[in-house]
Swiss-Prot record:
Any Gene Ontology CC annotation: cytosol
Keyword ATP-binding included in the entry's annotation: yes
Organism: Ligilactobacillus salivarius (strain UCC118)
An individual GO BP term: dTDP biosynthetic process
Identification of the protein by name: Thymidylate kinase
Record function comment: Phosphorylation of dTMP to form dTDP in both de novo and salvage pathways of dTTP synthesis.
EC number annotated for this UniProt entry: 2.7.4.9
Pfam family, one: Thymidylate_kin
UniProt keyword annotations, A-Z: ATP-binding, Kinase, Nucleotide biosynthesis, Nucleotide-binding, Transferase
MF terms (GO), sorted A to Z: ATP binding; dTMP kinase activity
Reactions the enzyme catalyzes: dTMP + ATP = dTDP + ADP
Amino acid sequence: MEGKFITFEGIDGSGKTSVLKGVIEHLNDKRIDNYIWTREPGGNRISEAIRKIILNVEYTEMDARTEALLYAAARRQHLVDTVLPALNEGKLVLCDRFVDSSVVYQGVARDIGVEPVIKLNEFATENLKPDLTLYYDVEPEISLKRISNNRQNQVDRLDKESMDFYHKVRQAYLSLAESNKERIKVIDASQNLDKVIDDTLSILNNFM
């Protein structure tokens, strides 16, 4: 039996990670344990080491293509060590970010181009695509305020990007969702957390 691969996407501060925690609580309450929860970049020893490089605030001079290559490298190892074994065991894989993040952040916001980023990640993932993607949409003004309020002592390199950068990321996500309506479901993340979790569970219940 093959598992299901569900990814959670959104700009930084969209609340997707908090929603994921709510989904995990729901699964645990229902005594559902045939799942894993993971993240990108990260999810295993090598990919977590790459994550530290990518997000290090000291590396503000990092070239956009270097960044894209590091994400792809972390993604490949994450798939091999974590995602694919779980899917082959028939598990539900809940992943905080996947290829869509690279498309919008590096492909669009960093101006590398969508096609080069897609091709790079096709190589890294061997064309593996999520069965379902949940995109948490929120205005950057709201998301960055959340970051400021909640992560004052944990600022990473991406938190230092401009408002214009995050507006580009958001618009890229919306365009991606528009062209992939079957796979990507848009959730209003400006609502309170409980409502966003309820909307998420409703979509997941219909999907499963």
